[in-house]
Every structure is written in C-alpha cells, then in structure tokens.
Design a protein with these regions (language model features):
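A short glycine-rich, Lys/Arg-flanked "PGG" loop and its adjoining helix->strand segment in the class I
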Residues: 82-83, 149-164
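A short SAM/SAH-binding and catalytic strip from SAM-dependent methyltransferases
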Residues: 134-148
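C-terminal motif of bacterial Sec signal peptides marking the signal peptidase cleavage site
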Residues: 13-15
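Class I SAM-dependent methyltransferase SAM/SAH-binding core
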Residues: 68, 73-126
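A short acidic, Gly/Pro-enriched loop at the edge of an enzyme's catalytic core
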Residues: 124-136
C-alpha cells in the first residue's frame, strides 16, 4: 500500500515538474501609470463629447462583427459596441478586477445584452480566445499595463488575420495617465504589429491608432524593447 502511494506521489510530482513554466518577458523601459477608478467619467458627459461614436466609426465597427473590449471597466464602450454589432455580432468584455467583472456582468444581465459575454483576465494576459475578433479595443487603459510586452504577446493571439487592434489614449506623459504616440507605436512594433490608421479625436488631446499584425510573433527572449 505504501509503495502504491509513494509511486502515485512521485508521478504527481513529476507531472508538476514537467509543466512548462511561464515565459519570461522583458520589462518596460518607461513609466507605468497606477490603476485608477474604473469610473472614467459620467456616461452622460462622455456621450456629450461623442468619443465612442467617433471611435467606432473610425474603427469600422459594423453589424455582425465580433469585438472585444479589453479593460472594459463599468462597460461604457461594451454597451455601445453591443448596439452597433447587433444581435448577429458578439462582444467580449474583459477586466482584471473580479469585483468590476461581477458588476459588469450584473449590468449586462440587467440591460439584457444577449450578445455580450464577460470574462476575467490577468494583468499581463487578457485570456482571449484565439483568432476570434474583428476588432480589439484598448480604450484609455494601455498606460496602466505593467508588463506591456507580455500583455501584447498574449493579446495579439485574439485578433483575426484581417482584424484590427484599436487603441485610444491621451497624448500626454504616462504619469499623467496618457501614452505618447511614439512609445505606443514602438511597443506594438516590437510584437510585430504596425499602425494602419491614426486620427486625433474631437475631444482634443485624445488620439486613436489602429494596428494590424504585420509579422510573426517573436519569442519572448527575442523581443526588441523600446
């Protein structure tokens, strides 16, 4: 009996040791903004600025598309994307804070958004299904990503071959909760993604950049940092 138990323990230990370790990614050579409240502004105030409508139009969001709202927070973009893609489309809303995810799930159920799913990711991996989305949206959140190379390495798996990753940021220093456009472009280029659209938004200092996968994903130890 002891021999069987010992053998089972050895097999379990060997299996644990055989599991591949998480790859090691280079650190960001820039500031990272602290995470702030997911309440960016009142929704009425944001609607008055009209940013969401402008962003969705520039990004080419259409009925029937599959889109992801990464770092969805309270779901401001989530619910508006759901309306545009319609019943034939799908929206995945992701956040890394369990309480925020739960509150967003409640909102989705309360507003009967049948085309929206909500999931929990991690700080460096949004856990997106592979090659599933026509558009991935990162809205006013990329400056808070602590491990951008790991995050982008995992993120790009979720976009379809002809899909776009759409970033909205403020053109100001990271410590002021913005992202200089040249830094954004460099970090995306390090993961094989190139910009195909850029625009300043009507709100003034905010900009949009849309990226497409242009090269194979490098292994973590081959990433050329900015």
């Amino acid at each position: 009996m002891w021999n069987r138990a010992a053998a089972a323990a050895c097999l379990a230990l060997a299996a644990c040791r055989a599991q591949p370790s998480e790859p090691q990614f280079p650190a960001a050579h820039r500031d990272v903004a602290p995470t702030v409240s997911d309440t960016f502004s009142t929704e009425d105030a944001r609607d008055r600025v009209g940013e969401a409508e402008q962003v969705m139009e520039l990004a080419g969001v259409k009925p029937g598309m599959s889109v992801a709202d990464v770092g969805a927070g309270e779901g401001y973009y989530t619910v508006r994307l759901a309306r545009v893609v319609g019943p034939r489309g799908r929206v995945l809303a992701e956040d890394i804070v369990p309480e925020v995810r739960d509150e967003l799930s409640d909102r989705v159920q309360r507003e009967r958004l049948d085309n929206v799913a909500v999931k929990l990711g991690t700080a460096d991996n949004p856990m997106l299904p592979t090659t599933s989305f026509d558009r991935l949206f990162l809205v006013h959140m990329y400056h808070e990503v602590q491990s951008p190379y790991a995050f982008l390495w995992h993120l790009r798996d979720g976009v379809k071959p002809d899909g776009l990753i759409v970033v909205v940021e403020a053109n100001r220093p990271v410590k002021q909760h913005g992202m200089p456009a040249n830094v954004l472009r460099c970090e995306f280029a390090a993961l094989g993604m190139q910009p195909v659209k850029a625009a300043m938004l009507s709100s003034g200092e905010n900009y949009l950049k849309a990226f497409r996968i242009a090269a194979p994903r490098p292994s973590p130890d081959k990433i050329q940092t900015c």
